[in-house]
Amino acid sequence: MSEYRLVMKGVVKTFPGVKALDHAQLELRPGKVMALMGENGAGKSTLMKCMFGIYKMDEGEIEYEGEKVTIPTPLDALNRGIAMVHQELQPIPARTVAENIWLGRYPTKKIGPITIVDHSKMYADTDALLKKLKLQINSHAKLGSLS
């Protein structure tokens, strides 16, 4: 087993007229809390979006649990257990409390060859979370209806 859960090596990402990442490196150990810090425009969000499959790296590689992997989409990242909280995240008033909590990472189930959102699990898990946090909020309530 690798010392690191996730390693990003030599990551290069360019946008028109801007080299956002110039051979960036990242090593994450299992069971450790890490902070990725830097000035505005340093490339922190760009690196995370490359890790999560939102941006395609121009160069570089990702190793996950000691194996070289390709993460072309956020769904591929989620299937590997990699998640990301986006700094631009905005709540959606027309969706329920549960839908906002699980936005972009809904629990799913298979019905034959089709994968669908597992609404029962989503609401049950949300209710358990709200209870644990001692919040008396209806998980089915539209976010815009709350004050």
Where are these regions (language model features)?
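Glycine-rich phosphate-binding loops of nucleotide-dependent enzymes
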Residues: 1-147
